[in-house]
Amino acid sequence: MTNQYGILFKQEQAHDDAIWSVAWGTNKKENSETVVTGSLDDLVKVWKWRDERLDLQWSLEGHQLGVVSVDISHTLPIAASSSLDAHIRLWDLENGKQIKSIDAGPVDAWTLAFSPDSQYLATGTHVGKVNIFGVESGKKEYSLDTRGKFILSIAYSPDGKYLASGAIDGIINIFDIATGKLLHTLEGHAMPIRSLTFSPDSQLLVTASDDGYIKIYDVQHANLAGTLSGHASWVLNVAFCPDDTHFVSSSSDKSVKVWDVGTRTCVHTFFDHQDQVWGVKYNGNGSKIVSVGDDQEIHIYDCPI
């Protein structure tokens, strides 16, 4: 166990173009950890994290255009990717094979997320709709309509009750999944919402915007609980730590920041990337952070827990 922050590993030239998305999954059966990256080079890559290094396991071909979003199932060894080619692909992480390709339609599936039970995949669209696909069926099961603009970001609450979406005009919508009803519309940002993340206890929603601010909302009451500044430019990604007390953010200012939820302060900043940092995630126990960016690198950091 480490008691300080530091960079642990750097994978240079991980892709041939900018890396825009990353996911970190734990295979409890094998006690192994998997990192999945999606890049504008049209590839999805699957890496094994072991002995404090990343080893490339699969390079997954199939997308015709850049990969903008990846996620890993919470229950099965499956990854999902969405691309500018308007297709969602499901991949078997045990053999590197494509399970299915879903045509998401002409209004690109920009961002995607597995539901907590991994039975569904939610994707945000250009026309303000969240489309929900069945993982098993590969078909669109239903849609949630924000009546808003292009959706850049979506997140499920870990308890499975809520789905939040963030749009290009800065509007955030929170839906009740059981009823499909729109519960709250939050107007805290005036610029695109690049990312949002629920706390592990599903009580808080953290949002990241091009306005350079991070906002924390109380989900139940839709109250603004905090506004955090510190990044010098667009905030591109946020991810909660499993311990419920910290979250991480990344920015086009080339930095990765770790924040304390209770004190609303930045407790550490990593300046290891050479360009915009598009994706950050914690591992399963919160002891590591992965980040990816336009510099085509994957960085793994140590976190005190």
Curated annotation (Swiss-Prot):
Coiled coil: none annotated. The keyword Transcription applies. It is found in: Nucleus; Cytoplasm. One of its GO terms (biological process) is transcription elongation by RNA polymerase II. SUPFAM superfamilies: WD40 repeat-like. InterPro entries: G-protein_beta_WD-40_rep, SKI8, WD40/YVTN_repeat-like_dom_sf, WD40_repeat_CS, WD40_repeat_dom_sf, WD40_rpt. Its main location: nucleus. WD repeats lie at residues 14-57, 62-101, 104-143, 146-187, 188-227, 230-269, 272-305. The modification N-acetylmethionine is found at M1. The modification N-acetylthreonine is found at T2. One of its GO terms (cellular component) is nucleus. Keywords: Acetylation, Cytoplasm, Nucleus, Repeat, Transcription, Transcription regulation, WD repeat, Wnt signaling pathway. Component of the PAF1 complex (PAF1C) which has multiple functions during transcription by RNA polymerase II and is implicated in regulation of development and maintenance of embryonic stem cell pluripotency. PAF1C associates with RNA polymerase II through interaction with POLR2A CTD non-phosphorylated and 'Ser-2'- and 'Ser-5'-phosphorylated forms and is involved in transcriptional elongation, acting both independently and synergistically with TCEA1 and in cooperation with the DSIF complex and HTATSF1. PAF1C is required for transcription of Hox and Wnt target genes. Belongs to the SKI8 family. Component of the PAF1 complex, which consists of CDC73, PAF1, LEO1, CTR9, RTF1 and SKIC8. The PAF1 complex interacts with PHF5A. Within the PAF1 complex interacts directly with PHF5A. Component of the SKI complex which consists of SKIC2, SKIC3 and SKIC8. This is Superkiller complex protein 8. It comes from Homo sapiens.
